[in-house]
Amino acid sequence: MYAIIETGGKQFRVEEGCKIFVEKLAADAGSEIAIDKVLMLGGDKFAVGAPYVENAKVTAEVIEHGRGEKVITFRKWRRNDSRKKQGHRQDYTALKIKTITA
């Protein structure tokens, strides 16, 4: 059984036991969270939400918080001897999917 969930403005296809990286959540490492924004359920209990599936829930365990790879932005102005280099690392939360209930 799988589900498509929405968190942090993005959609993820999850199954029980899989590990996903989502935008940073305000939860401690080792705690469990419940995600009720389930857009679709697949498998035996197929259901499509409008926009969310009623009484569907995905529980996940917070594994860790971290920062992603550095993304470099570079801008150069020609003939001015001017340039701008900037780096960014996005915060993330690693989740392990425990159960999918419908």
Swiss-Prot record:
Taxonomic superkingdom: Bacteria
GO MF: rRNA binding; structural constituent of ribosome
Presence of the UniProt keyword Ribosomal protein in the record: yes
BP terms from Gene Ontology: translation
GO CC entries: cytoplasm; ribonucleoprotein complex; ribosome
Record's keyword terms, sorted: Ribonucleoprotein, Ribosomal protein, RNA-binding, rRNA-binding
InterPro entries: bL21-like, bL21-like_sf, Ribosomal_bL21
PANTHER family the record matches: 50S RIBOSOMAL PROTEIN L21 (PTHR21349), LARGE RIBOSOMAL SUBUNIT PROTEIN BL21M (PTHR21349:SF0)
Record-stated family: Belongs to the bacterial ribosomal protein bL21 family.
Subunit structure: Part of the 50S ribosomal subunit. Contacts protein L20.
NCBIfam families in UniProt: L21
Protein function: This protein binds to 23S rRNA in the presence of protein L20.
Name used for this protein in its record: Large ribosomal subunit protein bL21
Gene giving rise to this polypeptide: rplU
